[in-house]
UniProtKB/Swiss-Prot annotation:
Name listed for the protein in its UniProt record: TATA-box-binding protein
Result of knocking out the encoding gene: In vitro depletion studies show decreased transcription. Restoration of transcription requires the TATA-like A box upstream of the promoter.
Reported function: General factor that plays a role in the activation of archaeal genes transcribed by RNA polymerase. Binds specifically to the TATA box promoter element which lies close to the position of transcription initiation.
Family annotation (Gene3D superfamilies): TATA-Binding Protein
A biological process term (GO) from this entry: DNA-templated transcription initiation
Amino acid sequence: MSNSAVSYKPIVNIENIVATVTLEQSLDLYAMERSIPNIEYDPDQFPGLIFRLEQPKVTALIFKSGKMVVTGAKSTEELIKAVKRIIKTLKKYGIKIMGKPKIQIQNIVASANLHVNVNLDKAAFLLENNMYEPEQFPGLIFRMDDPRVVLLIFSSGKMVITGAKREDEVSKAVKRIFDKLAELDCVKPIEEEEELEL
């Protein structure tokens, strides 16, 4: 079957967004620990305060410099909602917040399923910027330049994408790698493989 018969029908899921938030003011973490419930702060163990939200389910590490690291959001919208909820909670418990928080996405981790089988040996030989050592790790590691992401590609057609800064970069990367693998004749429909095993 030619690679043109392999259809593009991926399922892509954002698994985690890591972002930094800058408040441009210093924070009294001891005062926050005393007044806000369900906060963890042990400066002997870690310099930041740990703030967990249930809805959306994210964790924020808050530092006295006014910087935060927020993890766990599954979309940009969820990230913004979480930051707003954190700020609202801080204000509710008497922490004065001046100005608007500046949010910068540092990394988006996503998973994808191409619904094809990938010939990793062939892909490793034909693709540039890759590393494939199946005796060490079962996936092919591919470094893409545009968008600038790293993809872990498995023979099952499943993959992990890291390094994106925007959600649309994830979709673009998945489409580009699929097109490249199809062009190099490294993908086969799953049904074809299953028929060969019978």
